[in-house]
Amino acid sequence: MKKPSAATEKALKRRLVEASWILAMEGQGDLVWGHASVRAPGQDTFWIKPTGLGLDEIRVEDLLLCDLEGRVVRGTKPRHIEVYIHSEVMRARPDVCAVVHTHALHPTVFASLGVPLAPVTHEATVFVPPDIPRFDETTDLINSPER
């Protein structure tokens, strides 16, 4: 598989940082939790923020390049423990080039109720039937591919 050009890689990293800032600005941040990732089409590696930084704090030079096993390929900062959310989605779906995981206040509160969520907007009806999806298999960190 052909490696992306330096210009493509630079643009992807810049867009990831900007997307993270927008997520933070829109209330998606939760201290240092929450992360987004991006990869060039057809690649087995992706860019993600390191642990210890909020969505609003990251800069291009902070980003890590990880492989689908969750190993850091490029970068020196510690990898986020939930890297497997991104690697497993990208492994299962080669067509997916970006993954976002956040802890927005209102969706988190509603998801914690443990009841089906009713679609109250036209956009939400895309998910019905059967229900607006939510992950409820664990409340722990996703710290391995098996989780």
Feature-to-residue mapping (PLM):
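Glycine-rich flexible loops
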Residues: 1-147
